[in-house]
Amino acid sequence: MASMKSLATAILVVLLLAALSREGRSQNCSAAIGELMTCGPYVLPGNNGAPSEQCCSALRAVNHGCLCETINIISSLPDHCSLPAVNCAA
């Protein structure tokens, strides 16, 4: 379970770094993505608990375009690391 928490934290750090390193990205977007670190416990597989109000508030503060672009950046990471694409079909 500790390794899953570490993985979730690493993913959120990557989110933050991706948002911060993107040219032309506003500071508001970077700060909002950084606030999503409070959602770390809720992105682990098997977590059935409700997110905290702090997490929900941070998510509400993120601009839709900023969130989508950050997700797209994360989706491209395997390709940039010479890894196969991840297919998360439901």
From Swiss-Prot:
GO CC terms of this entry: extracellular region
Record Pfam families: Tryp_alpha_amyl
Secretion signal span: 1-26
Gene3D superfamilies per record: Plant lipid-transfer and hydrophobic proteins
Cystine pairings recorded for this chain: 29-66, 39-55, 56-81, 68-88
Keyword vocabulary terms for this entry: Disulfide bond, Secreted, Signal
Keyword Transcription listed: no
Localization of this protein: Secreted
Family recorded in the similarity comment: Belongs to the A9/FIL1 family.
Protein name as annotated: Protein LIM1
Source organism (scientific name): Lilium longiflorum
This protein's encoding gene: LIM1
